[in-house]
């Protein structure tokens, strides 16, 4: 980080606006993700584990209460993002098809 600061390349996502953010396997770990997304002007690219039900989450290998702050269903994530001013542009399960069980990727655009 010192090198980034020295060369004036450090970006603080909670303070400095940007056009796009890419968060692969990150969102579910952030208690304050709405604060970060408030500084993103155009695009949010996300990959998160998705669950069908609470029971499904509790039985999943992705159930990590010491690491994960959030457990999303597909509709739950889309609804939260909608409330934060985002619209779903694309969703894919390619990561799951490639062996990353229950991981889905999303592209959201700012409304």
What is each residue range found by the language model?
Residues 1-59, 66-97, 101-111:
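Conserved SAM-binding loop
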């Amino acid at each position: 980080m010192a090198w980034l600061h020295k060369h004036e390349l450090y970006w603080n996502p909670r303070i400095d606006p940007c056009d796009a953010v890419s968060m692969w396997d990150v969102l579910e770990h952030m208690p304050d993700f709405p604060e970060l997304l408030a500084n993103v002007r155009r695009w949010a690219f996300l990959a998160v584990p998705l669950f069908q039900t609470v029971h499904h989450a509790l039985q999943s290998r992705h159930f990590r209460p010491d690491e994960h702050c959030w457990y999303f269903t597909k509709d739950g994530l889309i609804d939260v993002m909608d409330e934060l001013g985002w619209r779903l542009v694309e969703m894919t399960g390619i990561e799951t098809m490639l062996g990353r069980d229950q991981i889905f990727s999303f592209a959201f655009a700012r409304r």
